[in-house]
Amino acid sequence: MNGSQDTAPLDPDIFPLLLFHYNNYMPMEESSDVDEPDHDNEQDADDASYKSDGDDEPEEAEKSHRVESAEEANDSLFLYSINTMQEPQCRGLDDLESHFYWVTPQGWLLMRHHDSRETFLGNPSTRERISLPSGQGDFLEENTTRCLLSHAPTDPNCVVLVINCRDTVLWYCSPAAGAQWFEHRYESWRLDESHSVVVGDMRRLTTFGGVFYADLFHTVVKLQFSPHPTFTVTPVGVRSLPLHSCTDFQLLESCGELFRVSFGQQCFVDELLHVGVERLDVAHMAWVKVHTLGDRVFLVNSRYFGASLSAQVAGLKPNCIYFLRRGDKGLYIYNMERGTTTLHNPGRHLQDDVAAEILLIPAA
């Protein structure tokens, strides 16, 4: 988003996108999951059968590296359109090479220039920029953080939140105020008795109605800014789950309700066994199983990201979950009606263990 003439806006019709970037010091790009055990439980979901169009074997990806030359950098950036299932003809986002950046579930990119430290929110579709304070310290130059927005950045109530994915600390600022970043350290024991569970699940925050939510399995944590950060912990009912497998959960908002998607696998075996969806029944504060998404589609990066879109608007298959797995270049599509999962190879030239980011188009 450096405003250069050779970097054109991306065509909205090619979104959503997979963004592969070999040399970028990407936030959370397969940072090790130290102190973050999987939940030793499994959702009661339909078995997923697999059809593969590539010979992709999931592996733990290596941490990506900083770019060493402009020529090498240009070859390291690869876009893949999820709705057309092919590489788009247009070239864009080359200016990512000179920035640290974080992809938000709202489609905006939090960006920070390597040299000038200029910091802003960038719209990859329109090239619009919204300036942010540069901040103190190195928290905007680390790959162990992620970013979310409470509202659209043009909303005066918008809070830009940066979460540390290895410690109980967060940073936040307001684009409207624009004065400075604030640091807040919170005590994990106030949210859960397990420090590692808190750190691991807080990185999977989602936004709903201007409030941030985290799923700690037996509780839902609500984080509000009024104007200072305030946590509220609410117990929720859960079904008893088998103990023979490990499950990752991703929280997301869809049509004004909270959902969580579960990905279950046999412990110590990198083979996906189950995909399930639950909705939070607010009246009874309990998770209930969902059998259909209707005309919606969920996009999930199982490491920390979830979003819901209209299938018709996005040009995707309705009642499906499009998801990425840790350390795996593959794009997986789970069909809720059939209970089957299809694996798509976005590029045979891509290394198998280079995971992508999901890039959405910001709402108008």
Regions found by a protein language model. Give the residues of each.
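A non-catalytic, helix-rich entry segment at domain boundaries
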Residues: 1-110
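Pocket-edge structural micro-motifs
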Residues: 21-22, 81, 113, 262, ...
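A sequence/structural signal of beta-propeller blade repeats
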Residues: 72, 94-268
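Beta-propeller blade signature
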Residues: 72-84, 169-179, 272-285, 331-340
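Residue-level signal for well-ordered, solvent-exposed loop/turn and beta-edge residues enriched
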Residues: 86, 128, 257, 286-288, ...
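Short amphipathic beta-strand/extended segments with alternating polar/hydrophobic composition
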Residues: 88-95, 132-134, 183-186, 234-238, ...
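A surface-exposed beta-alpha-beta supersecondary segment
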Residues: 103, 139-155, 261, 276-279, ...
